[in-house]
């Protein structure tokens, strides 16, 4: 139930370090970059809510570690709710990314499995990076030793980009696609659509295809029509 990178395949193209818009999270970016490429670097624990960029950094780290020649495993723990014990079988990789470790909270056997993995990785020199909604001290863990181990990592509470930063990112990414987003379009979009950067960039990809197919500029009427046809829940 873990994900390894098969030969010839790639991690998500957009979720690379160079596409991470750090804002106030420059120190976290630097720490994760170091962990992914330099053996012996401090382990990292990233916390933050939806849209904070923690999964982006995790995927970017996996990709960078793979490109540096390391064997990589990625565990999306929230997606493994019925298979938490897969954690116990994780072994043999040089870089392991554990996404949403808070999903294990309250699962006694899974907490012990993660505790054992932590200790094995430390003994074997494996690099670990963790993400969760909250800092280790705030997790509802039943195993105090696990909380202590996670708390020993270098911790970063990721801060979401401000609206002004999201607008600039969206304009810049649109320009790379040959799309002009004027302030009127951005005002309309930000008033009616999710402000999560990942969702906005996904929308931009779809707008790029739709505007090319229709041979039209992205205007408010075009955007309104596009969202209506897509049956967006945000419209």
What do these predicted ranges mean?
Residues 1-34, 39, 212-235:
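A short, basic N-terminal segment
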Residues 40-58:
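Walker A/P-loop nucleotide-binding motif
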Residues 67-95:
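AAA+/P-loop NTPase substrate/partner-engagement loops
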Residues 86-131:
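Conserved nucleotide-sensing/catalytic segment adjacent to the nucleotide-binding pocket
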Residues 136-151:
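Short regulatory helix/loop adjacent to the ATP-binding pocket of P-loop NTPases
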Residues 153, 167-180:
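Conserved AAA+ ATPase "sensor/coupling" helix adjacent to the nucleotide-binding pocket
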Residues 153-165:
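Conserved AAA+ ATPase "SRH/arginine-finger" region at the nucleotide-binding site
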Residues 187-191, 198-212:
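C-terminal helical "lid" of AAA+/P-loop NTPase domains
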């Amino acid at each position: 139930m873990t994900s390894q990178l098969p030969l010839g395949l790639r991690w998500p193209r957009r979720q690379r370090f160079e596409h991470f818009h750090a804002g106030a999270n420059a120190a976290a970016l630097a720490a994760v970059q170091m962990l992914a490429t330099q053996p012996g670097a401090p382990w990292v624990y990233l916390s933050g809510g939806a849209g904070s960029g923690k999964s982006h950094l995790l995927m970017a780290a996996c990709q960078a570690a793979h490109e540096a020649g390391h064997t990589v495993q990625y565990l999306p723990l929230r997606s493994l709710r019925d298979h938490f014990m897969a954690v116990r079988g994780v072994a043999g990789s040089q870089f392991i990314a554990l996404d949403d470790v808070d999903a294990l909270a309250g699962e006694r056997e899974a907490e012990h499995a993660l505790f054992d993995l932590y200790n094995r990785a430390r003994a074997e020199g494996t690099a670990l990076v963790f993400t969760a909604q909250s800092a280790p001290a705030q997790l509802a863990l039943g195993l105090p030793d696990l909380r202590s181990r996670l708390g020993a990592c270098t911790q970063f509470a990721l801060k979401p980009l401000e609206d002004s930063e999201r607008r600039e990112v969206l304009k810049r990414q649109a320009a790379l696609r040959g799309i002009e987003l004027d302030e009127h379009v951005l005002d309309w979009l930000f008033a009616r659509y999710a402000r999560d950067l990942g969702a906005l960039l996904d929308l931009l990809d779809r707008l790029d295809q739709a505007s090319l197919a229709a041979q039209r500029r992205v205007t408010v009427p075009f955007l309104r029509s596009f969202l209506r046809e897509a049956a967006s829940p945000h419209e």
